[in-house]
């Protein structure tokens, strides 16, 4: 049985876009979630102990997340907790808990976002069904950036790290693609 959880927190770094030997895109990221509690004696809000949770995304979803998310962004992520056992170079056995992310996006509590549907493999923008009557359509800067990140990572240039559009301004576009649960590669 999988444990499905929802985590709200801030990204500690830009998502790391890489490719497996078979060519599948994969993104790793860490979400820091800090509980806040109200202290009635002092009349102030106090931070609790932060939780740092490592998350992973695959394929087109990984490419879209790398193009849309950046360090410091407040996100909400839903996924399954998975335990991973591994051995260090020194031969020590270790265990880690990771979040296999099913859904992730920026929270709208302190920001706004304009979303546009990405076409196959995160390239280009399909027509916006919610566009105004002028039929505004065009190339989304984040989608174009997604293509650059993908090419750089495939060529080993920056491996996608620090290659992201780091704007976290009100009204920024966020590109994403619907990801059916049958397509989740785990």
UniProtKB/Swiss-Prot annotation:
PROSITE patterns: SSB. One of its GO terms (biological process) is DNA replication. Residues 175-186 have a biased composition (Acidic residues). GO terms for molecular function: single-stranded DNA binding. Residues 1-108 form the SSB domain. Keywords: DNA-binding. InterPro entries: NA-bd_OB-fold (IPR012340), Primosome_PriB/ssb (IPR000424), ssDNA-bd (IPR011344). Pfam families: SSB. This is Single-stranded DNA-binding protein 1.
């Amino acid at each position: 049985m999988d444990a499905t959880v929802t985590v709200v927190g801030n990204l500690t770094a830009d998502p790391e876009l890489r490719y497996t030997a078979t060519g599948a895109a994969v993104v790793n990221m860490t979400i820091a979630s800090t509980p806040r509690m109200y202290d009635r004696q002092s009349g102030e809000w106090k931070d609790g102990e932060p939780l740092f949770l490592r998350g992973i995304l695959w394929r087109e979803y990984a490419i879209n997340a790398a193009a849309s998310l950046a360090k410091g962004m407040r996100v909400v992520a839903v996924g399954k907790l998975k335990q991973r056992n591994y051995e260090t170079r020194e031969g020590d056995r270790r265990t880690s808990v990771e979040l296999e992310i099913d859904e992730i996006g920026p929270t709208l509590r302190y920001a706004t976002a304009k979303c546009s549907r990405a076409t196959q493999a995160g390239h280009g923008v399909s027509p916006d069904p919610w566009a105004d009557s002028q039929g505004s359509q065009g190339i989304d800067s984040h989608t174009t950036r997604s293509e650059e990140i993908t090419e750089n990572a495939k060529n080993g240039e920056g491996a996608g790290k620090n290659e992201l559009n780091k704007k976290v301004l009100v009204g920024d576009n966020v590109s994403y693609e619907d990801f059916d649960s049958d397509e989740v590669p785990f």
